[in-house]
Amino acid sequence: METQTRKAEVAHKLIETGESLLNIVWYRADERRAASLEIIARTAYTAEESACHYLETIGLDRKGRIRETLELACYQDTNEQTHEDIFARDLNGLKNWGDRFLARHIAVIIYWIFAITTLIDHELAALLGEAVEVEAVKTYRRMLIEQSDEWLNQPAVPTALRYWNKPNSMWRVRGDRQPASMREVVESIVKDESDHVHANAQKAIAF
């Protein structure tokens, strides 16, 4: 965790506990785990966007910080949607009905948890998001170690190439080169998740 406060420790412990339960089902760092967890994790940004829209609508955004947070959450959401599409669509990580059912139902629960928490205590919601991304970094670093060279050296999937070609994508803004293999795609995703850790830490003190 980038944020070193008591509340951040509590947030990280909560997410670690949830992660340990999910590890029972999705224990390998593969496309199945990545696709399922991205559905769940991305929902947190969707919920934050909804809550920020509401707070802005009722007139609480006097300094423009809520709008800035909303725009950042939308940018992060788009990036996480790309991750989901890479592993769920291109690599067929959600081919099992059970994975789709479980991931999507957990995502609905996560949506309401994050939406309500954002309305009540945005700092805590952002710290929970930071903790989620800390765990995501671990997952993708494991993927680089646990997946076979054959898997990592396969060509970069179409979604990854389309995302890189967007001028405002995180990969282009950061200066990443166009990925040629899945190894390079995963390396860029590790950087994405690390950037989300920092962004969520900053959002925790935004308003």
Regions of interest found by a model, annotated:
Residues 1-207:
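Non-heme di-metal
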